[in-house]
Amino acid sequence: DYINRRAGRVLEIGVGTGLSLDRYATHLQVTGIDVSADMLDKARRKVAERKLAHVVRISEMDARTLAFPDGHFDTVVAMHVISVVPEPEKVMEEMARVCKPGGEVLIVGHFARDKGFLAALERLFAPLANVIGWHSDFELGRILGVRSLEVIRTMPMPPFGIFTFLIQRKAEAARAAA
């Protein structure tokens, strides 16, 4: 719902089979990228079958080297992918680069807790979780180092606050250069 209150161009990193594409409001112009050609074929079929005219492009692309100009998107989204991509810090830099000044970078993911019983469980099971691609020990701080992005809000999400919704705003050009 938050994304649908935004306007303009949206880039979804790790769009996969397009699970979220029909949930975007029709006033948005959505581009989805992923590294899996097979998953993108399914996403393209979904766009065609459901006549999702607001989805303007589906492309095979590595999020570490986005083939878009600086400041091209009003909103850049990564749902449940930032902890599993190679070089997440580089991905964040690229997301910030293609986001317009004043635009937002939105992340949904699981981030390790730093204290409490659940934090201890995450650390205990991290080796097993990593084998299946779930990085329960991935720390939020790893992706907060992009100078041009300011954290606006973090919110726990269902179920049980396991996931976090992170909202970052890209600084206006003059502030980002400072």
Give the positions of each predicted feature.
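A short SAM/SAH-binding and catalytic strip from SAM-dependent methyltransferases
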Residues: 75-87
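C-terminal lobe and adjacent flexible extensions of AdoMet/dcAdoMet transferase-like proteins
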Residues: 165-178
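Class I SAM-dependent methyltransferase SAM/SAH-binding core
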Residues: 11-13, 17-65
